[in-house]
């Protein structure tokens, strides 16, 4: 039998300069640049995964500009997306609080065919920097209160938790595509991506 292809559109949103473009580059090309370049409107990348012996996953990554003036266009950008990543900078409390605005904007404009919200991960980026402007307890509570699938800390620079977090998101999309009602049911928990409980993300 031939390989079965799954195509998913994944949004990457959040305030400007939180690391969205760097995340997309790291995940799709395994590269990182120290030089900041502002996204204008939207940028795109493709990631292909051999999910199993018989299944191929193709991810269209939509890197949405974080500037306020572009938010009127988000309905167009969000259309037909299967999942979302919302990012903030752990050293910048404003980007954290604005994650709620991004989540509300997303939920008001995009749902799954079932009417449920699309899976959405909250990524606490730049975790290699200090001091953090928010605590893990604050993030955990915020994630649960705002209906995120889960959250974890990431460092695009150090390539920490990037592939692991995206794998969790792909698993959620694959489960949704199979209409598996017994699939991942986590709502907002910290997702433990590592063997040690202190450095990952809780799910399930």
UniProtKB/Swiss-Prot annotation:
Entry protein name: Ras-related protein Rab-7L1
Residue positions where Phosphoserine is found in the record: 72
Quaternary context: Interacts with LRRK2 (via the N-terminus); this interaction is direct and stimulates kinase activity.
GO cellular-component term (any): cytosol
Family that this chain belongs to: Belongs to the small GTPase superfamily. Rab family.
Membrane disposition: Lipid-anchor
Function (record text): The small GTPases Rab are key regulators in vesicle trafficking. Essential for maintaining the integrity of endosome-trans-Golgi network structure. Together with LRRK2, plays a role in the retrograde trafficking pathway for recycling proteins, such as mannose 6 phosphate receptor (M6PR), between lysosomes and the Golgi apparatus in a retromer-dependent manner. Recruits LRRK2 to the Golgi apparatus and stimulates LRRK2 kinase activity. Stimulates phosphorylation of RAB10 'Thr-73' by LRRK2. Also regulates neuronal process morphology in the intact central nervous system (CNS).
Presence of keyword Signal: no
Phosphothreonine modified-residue sites: 71
UniProt GO molecular function: GTP binding; GTPase activity
Annotated GTP binding sites: 33-37, 39, 126, 156-157
SUPFAM superfamilies membership: P-loop containing nucleoside triphosphate hydrolases
Main localisation: membrane
Lipid-anchored residues (S-geranylgeranyl cysteine): 203-204
GO biological process, one term: cilium assembly
Xref: InterPro entries: P-loop_NTPase, Rab29/Rab38/Rab32, Small_GTP-bd, Small_GTPase
Transport is among the record's keywords: yes
One Pfam family hit: Ras
């Amino acid at each position: 039998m031939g390989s079965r292809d799954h195509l998913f559109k994944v949004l990457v949103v959040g305030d400007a300069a939180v690391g969205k473009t760097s995340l997309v580059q790291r995940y799709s090309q395994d590269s990182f640049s120290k030089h900041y370049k502002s996204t204008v409107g939207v940028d795109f990348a493709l990631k292909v995964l051999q999910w199993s012996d018989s299944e191929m996953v193709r991810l269209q990554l939509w890197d949405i500009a974080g500037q306020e003036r572009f938010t009127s266009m988000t309905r167009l950008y969000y259309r037909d997306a299967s999942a979302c990543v919302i990012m903030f900078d752990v050293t910048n409390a404003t980007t954290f609080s604005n994650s709620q605005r991004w989540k509300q904007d997303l939920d008001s404009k995009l749902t799954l065919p079932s009417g449920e919200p699309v899976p959405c991960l909250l990524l606490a980026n730049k975790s290699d920097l200090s001091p953090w402007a928010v605590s893990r307890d604050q993030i955990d509570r915020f994630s649960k209160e705002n209906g995120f699938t889960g959250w974890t800390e990431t460092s695009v620079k150090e390539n920490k938790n990037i592939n692991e977090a995206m794998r969790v998101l792909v698993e959620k999309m694959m489960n949704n595509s199979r209409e598996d009602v017994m699939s991942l049911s986590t709502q907002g928990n910290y997702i433990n991506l590592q063997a040690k409980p202190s450095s990952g993300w809780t799910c399930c």
